[in-house]
From Swiss-Prot:
It is a peripheral membrane protein. This is Flagellar motor switch protein FliM. InterPro entries: CheC-like_sf, Flag_FliM, FliN-like_C, SpoA-like_sf. Keywords: Bacterial flagellum, Cell inner membrane, Cell membrane, Chemotaxis, Flagellar rotation, Membrane. Belongs to the FliM family. One of its GO terms (molecular function) is cytoskeletal motor activity. FliM is one of three proteins (FliG, FliN, FliM) that forms the rotor-mounted switch complex (C ring), located at the base of the basal body. This complex interacts with the CheY and CheZ chemotaxis proteins, in addition to contacting components of the motor that determine the direction of flagellar rotation. It is found in: Cell inner membrane; Bacterial flagellum basal body.
Length: 331
């Protein structure tokens, strides 16, 4: 019964997919990116494991400070949401990814960078103010933070190039906040990024490290890797199976969450036009209530029920899912 109803709703969804997909499933436009990263999941997990070890090693080379970093999650979001989420409590930089001429973003919580500089190099003048966070950065502080970002990015993208046939060369720009990145480097607020987030603890300070890649580039990288792996039949066949299964599940999510309009015909009555024209205020029209009431969506029968009174309200009492093989008799 349920499967029959689900198939009916699927037909309704497919019929109106263009009109309702954005309302029903807000992440529909990023579905392909999630599929991409599912396919790259094992490669990315191995890459991040190596990256975390290398990052910890670099920190320990500077001092004996206790450092722990772990991969938190990745999210796909527009640049305006990145700015909204991390606001101005992070030091940020943007970098160019050559030869694709795409811009990425790296940021770290200011309490982490502040502590590192203070612990390793004797302090800094990093303070929040109404004039903006970066007005208080000294030249030495900027150089130190940029060096830290450079180490992080070089190691990260060295490993990224190992898991993807899409090779990247990083060109760091100047240290700045997210508003400056938006204005100076012409990142559109609607541009979409994959943000890899890492939990970071240095001594007793906790914060976040984030690396943002443009989704278009990330998607392109995985596509290039798949195309160049055409001789690996098992790899292609596995990816095809994974893609098919995930698309089925995603489509099921879309169908289960789609909003359909139910129309319920409570009565049936037949009358001639001459009688309708002859009606006067107060005239009574006898009606014949149906024994079985059907709830329709887009003229597709979905539910069978009864018309009843419940707590002084007229209600549709569900009896069963509609089954086209049964004959529902009406009175």
């Amino acid at each position: 019964m349920q499967s029959d109803v689900i198939s009916r709703v699927k037909k309704i969804y497919i019929k109106n997919k263009i009109d309702i997909s954005s309302k029903i499933f807000p992440y529909y436009q990023t579905t392909d990116y999630y599929l991409t990263y599912h396919n790259m999941k094992d490669r990315l997990e191995n890459m991040h494991e190596c990256f975390l070890k290398q990052f910890t090693k670099h920190i320990s080379e500077y001092s004996d400070v206790d450092c722990k970093i772990s991969f938190y999650k990745f999210i796909i979001q527009k640049f305006k949401n990145i700015k909204k989420n991390i606001k101005n409590n992070s030091i940020s930089d943007c970098f160019e990814i050559s030869p694709y001429k795409k811009l990425g973003i790296i940021f770290v919580s200011d309490n982490i960078s502040d502590y590192l500089i203070e612990y390793l190099f004797g302090g800094c003048e990093l303070k929040n103010s109404s004039n903006g966070l970066f007005k208080k950065l000294t030249l030495s502080t900027i150089n130190i933070v940029k060096k830290m970002f450079k180490i992080i990015l070089e190691q990260y993208y060295f490993l990224w190039n190992k898991v993807s046939l899409c090779k990247m060369k990083l060109i760091l720009n100047r240290l700045q906040n997210l508003n400056e990145i938006s204005n100076v480097n012409f990142i559109n607020s609607k541009d979409t990024f994959v943000t890899f987030l890492f939990r970071l603890r240095i001594a007793n300070k906790f914060g976040m490290l984030g690396i943002c890649l443009p989704t278009s580039l990330s998607f392109q990288c995985n596509n290039e890797a798949d195309v160049n792996s055409v001789h690996n039949v098992s790899h292609i066949s596995y990816d095809n199976v994974v893609n098919t299964e995930i698309r089925k599940r995603l489509f099921q999510v879309i169908v289960y969450n789609c909003k359909i309009v139910l129309k319920i015909v409570l009565i049936e009555n037949y009358i001639t036009l001459s009688k309708i024209i002859a009606f006067k205020v107060g005239d009574i029209l006898p009606i014949h209530m149906l024994d079985n009431v059907v709830a329709y969506s887009e003229n597709v029968p979905i539910l069978i029920g009864k018309y009843k009174m419940f707590k002084n309200k007229y209600v549709f009492c569900v009896v069963d899912y509609y089954n086209s093989t049964l004959n529902y008799k009406n009175g």
